[in-house]
Amino acid sequence: MDSRVIEIRKHLKKKLDPMRFEHTLGVSYTCQALAMRYGYDLDKAELAGLLHDCAKRYDRPTMLEKCISRGIPVSESEERDPSLLHAKLGAWMAREKYGVDDEEILSAIACHTTGKTDMGMLDKILYVADYIEPRRCKAADLPRMRKLAFEDLDLACLSIMESILRYLGTLDCPIDPLTIAACNRMRAVAARSREQAAAGNGEAGPEKIKEENTVESVKRNGKTRSRGAGREKGRRYKNY
């Protein structure tokens, strides 16, 4: 366990409301479980989970004000909906208030709400853990998402992004372009993962099937030509 964890927990318990603190513990626990499943550093996963919502102690106007005063970039989407800023502000607080200097942890905290196009392992772990943690009960399709998270992290990440986009679409809410870009990128990543898995299992893709059919056809034609040549040769010997 990272030596800072106990003190951070104590501090967060004082600063966050009880429900938010319980959610934080659930995400931290789930991050560690996913880290064990996918061979990632447990301490880094735990810290990312603990601090991902550390800026949720502030209301929306205060988050916007703090980001502006600290020189944290604010997009048009974030200006319209400052609640999105808790991720960026949380990453800043993790560095400046809690002494975290690990770039993977800071990246995961900063993108856990919208995602991003070049998500690393910890980015995906935190993004998924935030959705499936044990205390969540209202998110869409939770049983399937929880199962999928421990089978295929990329596909789980994509499925959660698509679910969130569908939900936001029903509310007619503006969608952050980062989320759309992240989802499109994750579709490509998930498709590549499926292709690699299929290749590893010996499943043939379209080009492989075409190649095998061509080879088989040549073999069959070769046999036909050999048998035909043999019969013709036999007839010549007989006539002779």
For each predicted feature, which ranges?
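Charged phosphate-binding loop/patch that engages nucleotide di/tri-phosphates or the phosphate backbone
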Residues: 167-218, 226-239
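Divalent metal-dependent catalytic cores for phosphoryl transfer on phosphate-bearing substrates
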Residues: 10-14, 37-159
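Generic N-terminal amphipathic, Lys/Arg-enriched alpha-helix
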Residues: 3-17
